Amino acid sequence: VTASPLQGSAESLARPVEVLAGTDLDEHKSGTLGDTVAKLPGVQSTFFGPGVGRPIIRGQEGPRVQVLSNGVGNMDASTVSADHATSIEPFLADQIEVLKGPATLLFGSGAIGGAVNVVDGRIASELPDRPLSGRAELRGNSVNDERSGMFRLDGVNGNWVLHVDGLVRDTD
């Protein structure tokens, strides 16, 4: 038996969260959101062919797992039909949060199995500290002959913020 000298809040105990960001996210990125988070404990990916992978959290999938983009529900056909890919692109993500347990009910009854929130910066939550910033990424995969590229630019002028991103993927 072990004890902690620091008392945790009830919310932190009931809120198991996995966060992929930075180098961890770069190493986990895959062609689908499900494949990107599949290496986390308790998480798997559906498979209905290449390019279609939605998260399965603790055995729950489909409408029981809420997929969010910047905290807003993703209304796409992947929720009700397994042969549709989710419209959220993991290559553009700044961080991906996977929530499991009772705290997911804060996102509504549709999140009874869990929630995956992709934070991609498309909607600015604060003014950037630099007038112009960006990133680009190129990837290749010899197994499925994949070639993909991504770019992102963020700019600020006074109280106006501009965000532009793009992705191209070619695979066999």
Task: State where each predicted segment sits.
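Predominantly transmembrane beta-strands of Gram-negative outer membrane beta-barrel pores used
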Residues: 66, 95-99, 115-172
